Amino acid sequence: MIHVEQLSKSFDDLRRGSIVALDSVSFDVEAGEIFGLLGPNGAGKTTCLRMLSTVLQPTGGVATVAGYDVMTQPQDVRTHIGFMSCNTGIYDRMTAWEMVEYFGRLYDIEENELQERLDRIFTTLQMNDIRDMLGSKMSTGMKQKVSIARTIIHDPPVLIFDEPTSGLDV
């Protein structure tokens, strides 16, 4: 499902020169497997996840997600993943339901199926009480639940979460 081989990322800094954010990381994740990246702050975990989601391009190595190369087939990768960044924004003027519904429409989910998925996700994540709440009125944990919901609305085969429990009571 995910194959990473010698994946690297460097950034150029005018003062410090080249900064290596990720250095030759390799791993494989099979379908159905839960896999976590562990390491101290600055180890490159978020950089790695952003490359897998095609937000950043690697400077070395190879990565495939659901059989698609992150460098040469980024659109195919994006349609097969749900990616939740650690700093995903929530629209202040939309309700929780509207935000998740909007993302479902971006993925062209048929209307009846979209409504069924919304009902199921809002019930499963215990979000019915914030269904009509504006983003501007939500707590950090509520916003995190909305981010999770919009990440999974299109039922992607691969989920990539960056700090998904931040702000949640777990």
What do these predicted regions represent?
Residues 134-138:
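Conserved ABC ATPase signature
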